[in-house]
Amino acid sequence: KGNQNSSDTTSRDTNATSHTYNLGHDFLLNNLISTNTALGYGDSDANDDTGDYENYDFSLRFNFAFPWAYISIGDSLSFIDYKKVDTSIDSGRLRSDFTNTIDLTITKALGDFFPSLDPNRSLFLNLYFERAISESNIRNYDYEADSFSFSVNRSFQIFK
């Protein structure tokens, strides 16, 4: 639950309870290439019924464990059907969205660049790019968005 401020009704009304179910399959082709596929279903119920929706998802991902870097390329398709008409936008049309999200992740050990800083190659640098294209039957909800991120991860073993 998000904002519980009684004076901000927009935030309170868009709070939602969601349940999602996914079925996935991972396939290791060889030591270099693996794939992931997934099917998903979700149901979200907001305090304000105009935010209630069901979504159906399909995703496909290819992973490449090259000796010089780990690269992962994915594509996800989401079909979102809203349950109630949002009268603030269009009083006669039930909203339905289609979103295609493509992403690319590149991971490289810091020790490959600076062996003295990370001799065990357990500190990883990650670059991530995502492009989302969403089309709706109500034009106000169409959008395209790009996202970039950079992160640093450290792996360690808790129990030996």
What are these regions (language model features)?
Residues 1-160:
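Gram-negative and organellar
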